[in-house]
Regions:
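Long, low-complexity, charged/polar intrinsically disordered regions in eukaryotic proteins
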Residues: 1-28
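Long, charge-rich, low-complexity alpha-helical segments
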Residues: 18, 26-116, 176-178, 252-285
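Short polybasic amphipathic segments
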Residues: 20-25, 235-242, 333-336, 447-449, ...
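Helix-biased "structured C-terminal domain" signature
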Residues: 57-60, 251-719
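Short amphipathic alpha-helical segments and helix-helix/interface helices
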Residues: 71, 107, 146-154, 534, ...
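Structural motif
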Residues: 93-101, 120-121, 136-141, 164-165
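A short, well-structured beta->alpha microelement
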Residues: 107-132
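E1/E1-like adenylate-forming module used to activate ubiquitin-like modifiers
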Residues: 130-233, 242-274
Length: 719
């Protein structure tokens, strides 16, 4: 035996679900594996194994030849690695000038069989002069030594750089000094961009990717260290080697404004009062009203897109304008805190339940630039909606804040029956999870909102405003994205969030009451993009129609629907709302595009099977009502976003409703994010304690009578 220890490389995760076995790479690509390889991978996913351990564990399933053949195949494909069992965890060196000689010293230490004495390395740092550069060599940037050392280095005003020498990669930098920008700023983004990978490293006790570095690797590291030590910017440099070719990437770091290490205790503005200003529009643009063209937004923010050093990791085109018949879709990845920290400290098991540790959003538009800007905005919106821990809150009983607060019962109006059957509802869909019931004797954390209607403070439950906020470990409500939007300015974000509330209020009334609605005469809309989309969808076998869901606010709301002749393929749905009906229709069609890759037969348990069997007439045009044409809608838009907001406030006030906003903007993102709340509007998720969901369709003339809770559509709205 050669005494080697095998391990699953850290950019791979082993997944077993519903009888299928797969490997997931760090970019979330799935690879399914054979039954024979499963035996080995299952063991290596748990922990590293020596050859002796592997052979003993699989001797009844694999022959000696089969075992070594599979190990060699997995090594060649970069899934597993092997290394001598004895090794050190990390190494510290310090020098006035980073030279090849110093890295040769590193090589000598790396070549030792015995583990380097960590205490001795820390002891040596007592002699570090202020101008010396400390290089911390670790197996990988997920190593906890980096975070621990960063705190000490910052307090001691050391200049230092991390270095990782991997099988096929060199990681160097950034160079950290005593000012702003430290490893905590990097680690916050780096770890939350890939929480499952980071979790796997923590579980592995950080041994898996260390190896004896070759002289060639060490000399390359020495050269790279010299370059990065002189770099003017704080940057992480990654060198990848594939065969004889090498590829170099630079990833630039910005300080995290709320870093507890290098930024200290920063005062956090509470966001009230919210002062708005005139914001002239640039004219009609793809996707709605903006103060800046999509291309300009992308140019301004593209350097904030980075998989290691930023809040938004990647923008990946999924549907081009050609594939989307005039519309594009771009998927974006963002740094997620949702369950990530609980995942890392063992509070949850990522293999069980609905652990949302992968932050992925989608954007759409008629142009690729608009789809990219939309995806970037969606990512920043979701990132900013997370609870980080530095946000100001006030803990109080309901009676202590009731005069200025909005009750959770108004914001999430579940019925008594729904609370009594929480588990059954939770199994229906990802969007029908019902929290624990709250009563007024349970104190809550409250955050400040601002009423644009009354120009005064409104206390709002913190758990309603943010993702992943728990009251003493209990969820009395779940944060969601309803009414949250990102924009180039506050006013832009507020209008986008407001239109989202309007479209979902209308969709909830229609869906749960199964109300028949008239269709739009799509032939009457001359926009080339609309007609091209219809024609191309028809060539693909889809019929496309759109229903009018406009309510008493007279803000056009449209749901676009597409269906094939195959009854087992789910309908595709897309919603849109705007002061101008043509924009509402464009938005609905663009959102429908996000489902174009889902035109396959619905699996067992899919919502479509339940809806189809119930004869869903409400999904089709009402033949008794005339088709809607552009002249049937009024245009309430203006040339200034502030005036549009004032009109929205007036529309809500006329119906006895209040428009409230909460500023979620994070300074590191470059966009404004606002949450818009109108207590009393319905959601399109099933909340059957809401009086409006019953009475609203009757007042509109959509239905003849108020339905009972048992008569409402039991299928949750599908997104």
């Amino acid at each position: 035996m050669r005494g080697e220890t095998y391990y699953l490389k850290k950019d791979w995760s082993f997944i077993e679900k519903a009888g299928q076995v797969a490997l997931m790479k760090a970019d979330y690509t799935l690879f399914y594996v054979s039954n024979q390889a499963t035996h080995l991978l299952r063991l290596l996913a748990e922990r590293p194994h020596t050859e002796e351990e592997l052979l003993a564990a699989v001797e009844e399933k694999l022959t000696l030849t089969e075992c070594f053949y599979l190990l060699e195949q997995l090594k060649q494909r970069g899934v597993i690695g092997c290394t001598p069992a004895a090794r050190h965890h990390f190494l510290l060196i310090h020098t006035e000038e980073v030279t090849a000689a110093e890295v040769e010293r590193l090589a000598a230490l790396l070549s030792e069989e015995d583990e380097v004495e960590v205490a001795g390395q820390w002891e040596a740092l007592r002699e570090v002069a202020p101008d010396n550069l400390v290089v911390l060599c670790v197996p990988h940037y997920h190593h906890p030594a980096l975070t621990a050392f960063n705190r000490i280095a910052h307090a001691q005003h050391w200049h230092w750089m991390p270095l990782a020498i991997g099988d096929d990669e060199l990681w160097v930098g950034p160079r950290f000094e005593s000012g702003e920008g430290c490893f905590e700023c990097l680690g916050f983004r780096f770890y939350h961009q890939s929480p499952v990978v980071h979790y796997a490293y923590l579980q592995s006790d950080c041994h898996l990717s260390t190896h004896r570095a070759s002289w060639r690797q060490l000399l390359a590291a020495a050269e790279l260290l010299r370059e990065e030590a002189d770099a003017k910017e704080q940057r992480l440099t990654l060198v990848k080697r594939t065969g004889e070719t090498t590829e170099r990437e630079h990833h630039f770091l910005r300080p995290w404004p709320h870093c507890p290490i290098c930024m200290g205790e920063q005062p956090v503005e509470e966001g009230v009062p919210v002062r708005l200003q005139s914001r002239p529009k640039i004219g009609y643009t793809d996707g709605g009203d903006r103060t800046e063209e999509a291309q300009a937004t992308i140019r301004r923010l593209i350097d904030r897109v980075d998989p290691f050093t930023s809040e938004v990791g990647r923008l990946t085109p999924m549907v081009t304008p050609e594939e989307g018949y005039g519309y594009s879709m771009v998927v974006s990845q963002w740094a997620t805190l949702r369950n990530a920290d609980r995942l890392w400290n063992g509070a949850v098991d990522w293999k069980k339940g609905r652990i949302q540790s992968l932050g992925v959003s989608a954007g759409k538009g008629q142009s690729l630039a608009q789809a990219e800007a939309s995806a970037l905005g969606e990512s920043i919106e979701r990132y900013s909606s997370q609870y980080f821990g530095y946000e100001p809150t006030h803990k109080a009983l309901w009676r202590e804040v009731a005069n200025e607060a909005i009750s959770p019962r108004v914001l999430i109006p579940y019925s008594e029956s729904q609370y009594a059957h929480r588990e059954e509802w939770g199994k229906k869909s990802d969007y029908s999870h019902i929290p624990e019931a709250w009563n007024e004797e349970i104190p809550l954390h409250w955050s400040k909102g601002w009423s644009l209607t009354h120009q005064q403070l409104r206390w709002l439950p913190t758990a309603y405003l943010f993702y992943n906020f728990l009251e003493e470990g209990v969820a009395y409500m779940y944060g969601d994205s309803n009414g949250v939007s990102a924009g180039n300015c506050r006013e832009e974000a507020i209008m986008q969030g407001f239109f989202e509330l309007i479209e979902r209020d209308a969709a909830g009334a229609w869906w749960y009451n199964q109300a028949l609605r008239p269709q739009l005469d799509l032939d009457a809309w001359p926009e080339p993009s609309i007609q091209r989309f219809r024609r191309r969808m028809g060539e693909r076998g889809f019929r496309v129609w759109a229903l009018d869901l406009t309510t008493e606010f007279r803000i056009p709301v449209v749901i676009a629907i597409a269906q094939t002749d195959n009854p087992n393929v789910p309908m595709l749905l897309g919603l849109g709302a705007h002061y101008r009906v043509e924009v509402a229709l464009q938005r609905a069609l663009a959102e429908l595009t996000q489902s174009l890759r889902e035109d396959t037969e619905a699996p067992e348990g899919h919502w479509w099977h339940t809806v189809r069997q119930a004869n869903p007439a409400y999904l089709y045009p009402d033949p008794t009502q005339p088709m809607r044409r552009p002249t049937d809608f009024i245009d309430q838009s203006t040339d200034d976003l502030l005036t549009d907001i004032e009109r929205a406030v007036a529309l809500m006030r006329a119906e006895g409703m209040e428009l409230i906003v909460h500023d979620l903007t994070r300074p590191e993102t470059g966009l404004n994010v606002m949450r818009v709340i109108v207590p009393g509007l319905s959601h399109f998720w099933p909340r059957f304690g809401d009086p409006r969901i019953y009475q609203h369709p009757v007042r509109l003339g959509w239905t003849a009578r108020v339905l009972t809770e048992e008569e409402l559509n039991p299928v949750p709205f599908p997104f």
